[in-house]
């Protein structure tokens, strides 16, 4: 009975990255031996145990055989005669098929260390194609390690494309697609995830609303990159630089979905694309079962992002109505989130990456002014029932108007 550190912990240590989770494989043991040693069994489908002290996961070495459709259609065989090499063979990528024994020796039967040096994400064996979830996992790894110069091996890319063409992605559940997407959105380069999916034709299967934006032109005056699909990924790149918030990054991804509905005869203009995109955001989020708070911000950003760009000329009444519409009084974080998504939209364009975005700062200032109006003072002044809300709104508009005269003076004449 021998334990080996495996997978991500070994990979990240070799890359000089912080190690978060440590997983272990145990060779030469039975479930009863693990229980006798004080381990707690947690795996239902195959034998996984928690260490009595560290609570880290220890899995018995196992092999897998395809026995059904999708990423759950596997029969596992775990027994003392399963070797470490056989266990590592079932892993997705060579850089994940690494192990380390107690004295620090690296066991690398499939060339993972060399691929780390080459910055390559390469599949371990043809069995890679038996699990459609791996298309998403590789896209996520590509995003996670893009800043280190990693790329996907051509033969792995070809295999991913073949899996998509064979309809394998139909076996993925919405929850798994969203889980991988959410994880990818936390990386430094989430745009790489979506670009990777597009490169292997998976984007049109999993995110048809985003794929539909490619080939849709926008006016060159405002969008030198012209293509709305390119612009979308540029805005996601910018959002990742501006905020670590998944809500902000996802809302930015979805901000221009309405442009995919514009009739070709009206190109390159997209009048009303914001409100038009709200239904597509709802559709995408319902299909992937995106959490409600993330969905709701994405809908608001789709509807109002262009309005923020015009903030210096907006009427005080319009600004206060905007705060009402986004429910800022109960969810004040939305003001900052919408400011960031609008900034990502403006700076996610060729040649505009370093642009200043004063509208974002002005939105936050206007919000501070509007929310500084005291509800207690309105009540103390004798207003009752519906009058309280009306007077509160009137005072907020007056306060924002006074602020706006100083901060956004309009030219005379």
Curated annotation (Swiss-Prot):
**Which residue numbers delimit the HD domain?**
228-329
Query: What biological process terms from GO does the record include?
Result: RNA repair; tRNA 3'-terminal CCA addition
Where on this chain does ATP bind? 8, 11, 91, 137, 140
Pfam hit, one? PolyA_pol_RNAbd
Give residues annotated as binding Mg(2+).
21, 23
Taxonomic superkingdom: Bacteria
Q: Which reaction does it catalyse?
A: a tRNA precursor + 2 CTP + ATP = a tRNA with a 3' CCA end + 3 diphosphate; a tRNA with a 3' CCA end + 2 CTP + ATP = a tRNA with a 3' CCACCA end + 3 diphosphate
Keywords on this record? ATP-binding, Hydrolase, Magnesium, Metal-binding, Multifunctional enzyme, Nickel, Nucleotide-binding, Nucleotidyltransferase, RNA repair, RNA-binding, Transferase, tRNA processing
EC id: 2.7.7.72, 3.1.3.-, 3.1.4.-
Record-level Gene Ontology MF annotations: ATP binding; CCA tRNA nucleotidyltransferase activity; cyclic-nucleotide phosphodiesterase activity; magnesium ion binding; phosphatase activity; tRNA binding
Instruction: List S-S links within the chain.
Output: none
Gene3D superfamilies reported in the protein's UniProt record: Beta Polymerase, domain 2, cca-adding enzyme, domain 2
Cofactors required: Mg(2+); Ni(2+)
- Entry's cofactor comment: Magnesium is required for nucleotidyltransferase activity.
**Comment text on domains:** Comprises two domains: an N-terminal domain containing the nucleotidyltransferase activity and a C-terminal HD domain associated with both phosphodiesterase and phosphatase activities.
HAMAP family assigned to the protein according to its UniProt record, in alphabetical order? CCA_bact_type1, CCA_bact_type2
- Briefly, what is this protein's role? Catalyzes the addition and repair of the essential 3'-terminal CCA sequence in tRNAs without using a nucleic acid template. Adds these three nucleotides in the order of C, C, and A to the tRNA nucleotide-73, using CTP and ATP as substrates and producing inorganic pyrophosphate. tRNA 3'-terminal CCA addition is required both for tRNA processing and repair. Also involved in tRNA surveillance by mediating tandem CCA addition to generate a CCACCA at the 3' terminus of unstable tRNAs. While stable tRNAs receive only 3'-terminal CCA, unstable tRNAs are marked with CCACCA and rapidly degraded.
Q: Which family does it belong to?
A: Belongs to the tRNA nucleotidyltransferase/poly(A) polymerase family. Bacterial CCA-adding enzyme type 1 subfamily.
Subunit notes for this chain? Monomer. Can also form homodimers and oligomers.
Q: What else is known?
A: A single active site specifically recognizes both ATP and CTP and is responsible for their addition.
PANTHER family, per the entry? MULTIFUNCTIONAL CCA PROTEIN (PTHR47545:SF1)
Protein name from the UniProt record:
Multifunctional CCA protein
């Amino acid at each position: 009975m021998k334990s080996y550190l495996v997978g991500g912990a070994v990979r990240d240590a070799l890359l000089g990255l912080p190690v978060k989770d440590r997983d272990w494989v145990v060779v030469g043991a039975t479930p009863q031996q693990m229980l006798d040693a004080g381990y707690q069994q947690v795996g239902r489908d195959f034998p996984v145990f928690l260490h009595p002290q560290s609570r880290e996961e220890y899995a018995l070495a196992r092999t897998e055989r395809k026995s059904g459709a999708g990423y759950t259609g596997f029969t596992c065989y775990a027994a003392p005669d399963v070797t470490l090499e056989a266990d590592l063979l079932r892993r997705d990528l060579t850089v994940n098929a690494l192990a380390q024994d107690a004295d620090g020796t690296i066991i690398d039967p499939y060339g993972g260390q060399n691929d780390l040096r080459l910055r390559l994400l390469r599949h371990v064996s043809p069995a890679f194609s038996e699990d459609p979830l791996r298309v998403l996992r590789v896209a996520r790894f590509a995003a996670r390690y893009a800043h280190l110069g990693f790329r996907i091996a051509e033969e792995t890319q070809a295999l991913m494309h073949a899996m998509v063409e064979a309809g394998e992605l139909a076996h993925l559940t919405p929850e798994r697609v969203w889980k991988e997407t959410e994880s990818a959105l936390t990386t430094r380069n989430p745009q790489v995830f979506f670009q990777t999916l597009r490169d292997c034709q998976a984007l049109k299967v999993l995110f048809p609303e985003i794929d539909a934006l490619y080939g849709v032109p926008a006016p060159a005056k405002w969008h030198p990159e012209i293509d709305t699909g390119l612009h979308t990924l540029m805005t996601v790149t910018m959002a990742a630089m501006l905020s670590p918030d998944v809500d902000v990054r996802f809302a930015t991804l979805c901000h221009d979905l309405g442009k995919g509905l514009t009739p070709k005869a009206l190109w390159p203009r997209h009048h009303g694309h914001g409100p038009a995109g709200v239904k597509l955001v709802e559709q995408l989020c319902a299909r992937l079962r995106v959490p409600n708070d993330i969905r709701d911000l994405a809908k608001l950003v789709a509807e109002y992002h262009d309005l923020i760009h015009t903030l210096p000329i907006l009427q005080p009444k319009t600004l206060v109505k905007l705060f009402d519409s986004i429910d800022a009084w109960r969810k004040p974080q939305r003001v900052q989130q919408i400011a960031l998504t609008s900034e990502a939209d403006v700076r996610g364009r060729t040649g505009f990456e370093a642009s200043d975005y004063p509208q974002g700062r002005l939105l936050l200032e206007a919000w501070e002014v509007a929310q500084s109006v005291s509800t207690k003072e309105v009540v103390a002044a004798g207003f009752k029932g519906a009058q309280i809300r009306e007077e509160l709104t009137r005072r907020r508009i007056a306060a924002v108007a006074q602020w706006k005269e100083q901060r956004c003076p309009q030219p005379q004449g």
